[in-house]
């Protein structure tokens, strides 16, 4: 569907500004080369159609198909192999959002299931969320790219998360973004190419070397070296 006064939209100052959340629709073909994705924001990947295989850090070759949403935390590198023709709606966001005025990300820590071990949790795209995503995709394809549009859609999306998923589901899904380890992860991922020596890394993190090594193993599941 075409926009009225398209030139006014395209020349608007707000089309040039970066929003706190950015949505995009991407189409992949089966024969497309594997995609390597480095991100400095957390990203939600909603598969509207098709199937892909995702490798992200220690999580290898996880199939992700139509009707599912995956979370890639910021400062992670992912390798995506296209298995079938695939359409993705992605939402990259900063961690300064809430589900609603009465429920924030911080609240999710209280709903992590007992003995939970994170294993790249995938959630189903519920019916109302699917309807929202399809309308959103059409609007983006029509050319609505205003900063305010993206920010309003972000708020609506997280209200849908609040409404159509249990708190336990959300805690399991957003687990990588919860707790004190996120700042440590960000620090390591932002500096590992700049700092080569573990002692200097520990010093920059204001930790003793044994504490840094222990924290690294707890956070990344492997020893620092």
Stretches with model-predicted labels:
Residues 125-138, 150-154, 171-205:
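A short, Lys/Arg-enriched amphipathic alpha-helix from helix-turn-helix/homeodomain DNA-binding modules
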Residues 105-133:
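Aromatic/histidine-rich interaction motifs
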Residues 160-167, 195-225:
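Basic/polar phosphate-binding segments, predominantly the helix-turn-helix DNA-binding elements
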Residues 1-19, 139-142:
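A short, N-terminal "cap"/entry segment at the start of jelly-roll beta-barrel domains
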Residues 17-113:
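N-terminal regulatory/effector-sensing and dimerization cores
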Residues 63, 147-151:
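Alpha-helix N-cap/helix-initiation sites
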Residues 48, 162, 189, 193:
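Short, locally clustered residues in the helix-turn-helix/winged-helix DNA-binding domain
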């Amino acid at each position: 569907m075409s926009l009225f006064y398209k030139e006014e939209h395209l020349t608007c100052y707000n089309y040039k500004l970066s929003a706190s959340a950015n949505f995009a629709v991407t189409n992949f073909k089966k024969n497309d080369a594997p995609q390597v994705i480095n991100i400095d924001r957390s990203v939600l990947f909603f598969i509207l159609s098709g199937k892909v295989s995702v490798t992200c850090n220690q999580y290898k070759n996880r199939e992700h198909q139509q009707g599912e949403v995956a979370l890639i935390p910021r400062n992670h590198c992912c390798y995506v192999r296209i298995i079938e023709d695939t359409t993705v709606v992605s939402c990259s966001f900063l961690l300064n959002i809430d589900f609603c005025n009465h429920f924030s990300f911080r609240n999710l820590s209280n709903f992590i299931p007992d003995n939970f071990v994170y294993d790249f949790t995938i959630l189903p795209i519920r019916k109302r969320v699917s309807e929202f995503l399809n309308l959103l995709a059409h609007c983006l394809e029509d050319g609505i790219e205003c900063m305010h549009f993206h920010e309003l859609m972000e708020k609506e999306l997280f209200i849908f998360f609040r409404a159509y998923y249990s708190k336990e589901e959300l805690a399991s899904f957003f687990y990588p973004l919860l707790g004190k380890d996120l700042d440590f992860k960000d620090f390591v991922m932002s500096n590992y190419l700049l700092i080569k020596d573990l002692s200097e890394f520990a010093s920059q993190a204001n930790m003793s070397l044994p504490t840094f090594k222990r924290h690294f193993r707890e956070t990344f599941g492997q020893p620092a070296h």
